[in-house]
């Protein structure tokens, strides 16, 4: 009985610790988006270029089987990887040309075309941090 109680206690501590490491990301992305980042079977990376004032995909790469994707997924949902103090609460919208990459998390290649979670990435200028934002949601984080 003591061993079972010890196991339940350890599991509870682990869950609380894990939640503490990801709480701000969950608040920023939302639970559904964070789940898509962590578990979507199909992931694409699109290179963006500004065309007629709009960000346009000029190159698409399927990274679903890429080495290190599991680490990237994890990094995208860990609070420590972002500068939460730099995030503008209601700052100005970045211009279309500021966004360098788009990541699509979807159920399939066909779904990536129109569905799925979309994250836009601004890699920033040299010596400056970048930004990440969820397409269709307000706010961004550095």
Task: Enumerate the language-model features and the residues they cover.
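Function-determining sites in protein domains
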Residues: 1-142
């Amino acid at each position: 009985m003591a061993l079972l109680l010890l196991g339940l206690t350890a599991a509870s501590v682990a869950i609380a610790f894990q939640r503490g490491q990801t709480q701000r990301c969950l608040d920023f992305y939302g639970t559904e988006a964070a789940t898509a980042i962590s578990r979507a079977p199909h992931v694409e990376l699109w290179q963006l270029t500004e065309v007629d004032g709009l960000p346009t995909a000029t190159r698409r790469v399927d990274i679903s089987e890429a080495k290190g994707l599991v680490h990237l997924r994890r990094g995208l949902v860990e609070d420590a990887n972002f500068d939460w103090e730099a995030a503008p609460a209601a700052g100005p919208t970045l211009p279309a040309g500021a966004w360098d990459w788009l990541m699509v998390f979807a159920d399939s290649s066909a779904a990536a075309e129109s569905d799925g979670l979309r994250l836009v990435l601004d890699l920033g200028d040299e010596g400056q941090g970048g930004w990440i934002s969820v397409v269709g949601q307000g706010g961004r984080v550095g």
